């Protein structure tokens, strides 16, 4: 990086995104930026002139994976036939933001480093790298990238739409405030316009994204202050849009209006991802979560009162510093009390620069492993039970992709379960199915009737 050697400008690219849905959104927008420059997408990194690794920094394993990928790309290029130049390598995303100039020092093959708030400058960085100039940008200007991104042009039946970025909660284990910055909300009009463009491009379902999405706030087209519920109600009126979802939420920002929207907005799907992280009040306080277990359970009760069939999802961390057996049992207790449709569990991963990384009482890896296995077994049991409870129900399924067998399609239920449907309904259509069987990770449905797209 920055060695002064020029190289041909890339004609093809491949974007590989790690981690959260927002990275998937960012990866798609980077691809659109590069296509707007005349490049075409390659099917794999091996076939691309430019490889963009859109990285995640939330856990050590995810952050380290980027370096193994860089090594693999370099080795494959070295082993390839003569005349095939090594692809240009760009590291984007949260590892880029956190490590910046350290990345090319550790991995000299990296040509470009670009943070998650600066990727709108990727075309210029590619041009700089091709000319042998330094190509690093980890600035965090508030929301300016959205003003320069190209209009959404083509889209599958489901789409992500970032409405909010950053986080001000400063949970003691989390790097997001340092890699994504302070909370910012995109303007109402920009979100509505992008949603319209996504629908025009083929989207039937839109998932609103944010690190703390239910903290979104802004003024509507009449100058009135709105929260996420107001934005959802506006999108509910868009012709052609069939489904709305949002993720990820913080318990402290579940407003009365947002809870009410779950019972009142027809297009808002009955699914809520609301992480609690732990069931012990002592651990929640050490995490700086700003809520307790009882308050979280009251929120779940209120949401279920508004929408009785809602599926609840969550995130859990085991082995946070100082976690005792009693604390872990409190986590199992809150899991049993909520009864999740699905959830994600992780071993605590100390991230440099976060308060938790230097806390006393770091839990032994073997203890974390045992706790994770117990927790995941309980969550798997709950997910399978939730799936079995849908057998015999009739629901709409949005067909998203081909299945493994000829004529088979896979779609999503309102509760975000994968549903396998035979008889080949077209991708992008809403079909009514009877759920006839359920496994731990998917359902099978019998086609009843089909709605026009």
Swiss-Prot record:
The keyword Cytoplasm applies. Monomer. GO terms for molecular function: 4 iron, 4 sulfur cluster binding; metal ion binding; N6-isopentenyladenosine methylthiotransferase activity. Its EC number is 2.8.4.3. InterPro entries: Elp3/MiaA/NifB-like_rSAM, Methylthiotransferase, Methylthiotransferase_CS, Methylthiotransferase_N, Methylthiotransferase_N_sf, MiaB_methiolase, rSAM, rSAM_horseshoe. Binds 2 [4Fe-4S] clusters. One cluster is coordinated with 3 cysteines and an exchangeable S-adenosyl-L-methionine. Disulfide bonds: none annotated. It catalyses: N(6)-dimethylallyladenosine(37) in tRNA + (sulfur carrier)-SH + AH2 + 2 S-adenosyl-L-methionine = 2-methylsulfanyl-N(6)-dimethylallyladenosine(37) in tRNA + (sulfur carrier)-H + 5'-deoxyadenosine + L-methionine + A + S-adenosyl-L-homocysteine + 2 H(+). [4Fe-4S] cluster 1 binds at residues 20, 56, 94. Residues 388-449 form the TRAM domain. Coiled coil: none annotated. [4Fe-4S] cluster 2 binds at residues 167, 171, 174. One of its GO terms (cellular component) is cytosol. This is tRNA-2-methylthio-N(6)-dimethylallyladenosine synthase. It comes from Rhizorhabdus wittichii (strain DSM 6014 / CCUG 31198 / JCM 15750 / NBRC 105917 / EY 4224 / RW1). Residues 153-385 form the Radical SAM core domain. Belongs to the methylthiotransferase family. MiaB subfamily. It is an enzyme of class 2 (transferase). Pfam families: Radical_SAM, TRAM, UPF0004. Residues 11-131 form the MTTase N-terminal domain. The gene is miaB. It is found in: Cytoplasm.
């Amino acid at each position: 990086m920055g060695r002064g050697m020029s190289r041909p400008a890339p004609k093809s690219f491949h974007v590989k995104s790690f981690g959260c849905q927002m990275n998937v959104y960012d990866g798609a927008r980077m691809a659109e930026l590069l296509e707007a420059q005349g490049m075409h997408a390659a099917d794999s990194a091996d076939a691309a002139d430019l490889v963009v690794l859109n990285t995640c920094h939330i856990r050590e394993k995810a952050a380290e994976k980027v370096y193994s990928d860089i090594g693999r790309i370099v080795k494959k290029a070295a082993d390839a036939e003569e005349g095939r130049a090594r692809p240009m390598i760009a590291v984007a995303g949260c590892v880029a933001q956190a490590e910046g100039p350290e990345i090319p020092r550790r991995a000299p093959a990296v040509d470009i480093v670009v943070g998650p708030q600066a990727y709108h400058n990727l075309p210029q960085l590619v041009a700089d790298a091709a000319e042998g100039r330094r190509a690093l940008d980890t600035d965090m200007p508030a929301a300016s990238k959205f003003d320069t991104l190209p209009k959404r042009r083509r889209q599958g039946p489901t789409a992500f739409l970032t409405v909010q970025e950053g986080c001000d909660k400063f949970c003691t284990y989390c790097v997001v405030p340092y890699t994504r910055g302070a909370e910012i909300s995109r303007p109402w009009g920009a979100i509505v316009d992008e949603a319209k463009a996504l629908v025009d491009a083929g989207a039937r379902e839109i998932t609103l994204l944010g690190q703390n999405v239910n903290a979104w706030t802004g003024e509507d087209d009449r100058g009135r202050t709105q929260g996420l519920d107001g934005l959802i109600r506006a999108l509910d009126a868009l012709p052609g849009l069939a489904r709305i979802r949002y993720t990820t939420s913080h318990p402290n920002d579940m407003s009365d209006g947002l809870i009410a929207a779950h019972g009142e907005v027809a297009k808002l799907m009955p699914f809520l991802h609301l992480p609690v992280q732990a069931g012990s009040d002592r651990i929640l306080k050490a995490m700086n979560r700003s809520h307790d277990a009882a308050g979280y359970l009251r929120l779940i009760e209120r949401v279920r009162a508004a929408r009785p069939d809602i599926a609840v999802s969550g995130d859990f961390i085991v082995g946070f510093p100082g976690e005792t057996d009693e604390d872990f049992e409190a986590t199992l207790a809150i899991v049993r009390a909520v009864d999740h449709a699905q959830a994600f569990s992780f071993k605590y991963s100390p991230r440099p620069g976060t308060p938790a990384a230097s806390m006393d009482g770091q839990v032994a890896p073997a203890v974390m492993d045992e706790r994770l296995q117990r927790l995941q077994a309980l969550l798997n049991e709950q997910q399978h039970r939730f799936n079995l409870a849908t057998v015999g129900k009739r629901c709409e399924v949005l067909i998203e992709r081909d299945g493994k067998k000829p004529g088979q399609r896979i779609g999503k239920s309102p509760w975000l379960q994968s549903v396998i449907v035979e008889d080949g309904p077209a991708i992008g259509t809403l079909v009514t199915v009877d759920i006839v069987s359920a496994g731990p990770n998917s359902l099978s449905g019998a086609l009843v009737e089909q709605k026009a797209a």
